[in-house]
Amino acid sequence: MIRETGEFVINLTTEELAFATDYCGVKSGRDVDKFKETGLTREKAEKVKAPMIAEAPVSIECKVKEIRELGSHHMFIAQVAAVHADEKYMDEKNRFDLNRARPIVYSHGEYLGTGKKLGTFGYSVKKAKKQAKKR
């Protein structure tokens, strides 16, 4: 489908959407209406014809620039046409809050939560604070 249209949308998925995400990855849209079966809401994209998922915290509209055949699958190299982020996942500094969104990753057949904050940029090279001398 992406090869024919040259467009797609990446919808960030979350712990809450994991079951629907798995269903959409297993079932073909040629056989079932994935939106109807999962209860997800189809949302019109601004720059591409592929739909966005309204429940996704982030949707990235993409236009294919190159397709590389890699044996059993294809890799799509695309240009980002638009990015949409749900306001409820933005913090007070207008940054996307991963802890609030609780995104998941897929690795080797398993869905995993992203877990806790491990550090901030530069924490590996920061000098330890000196303790005040006791009197």
List each language-model region with its residue ranges.
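Basic, polyanion-binding surface patches
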Residues: 1-135
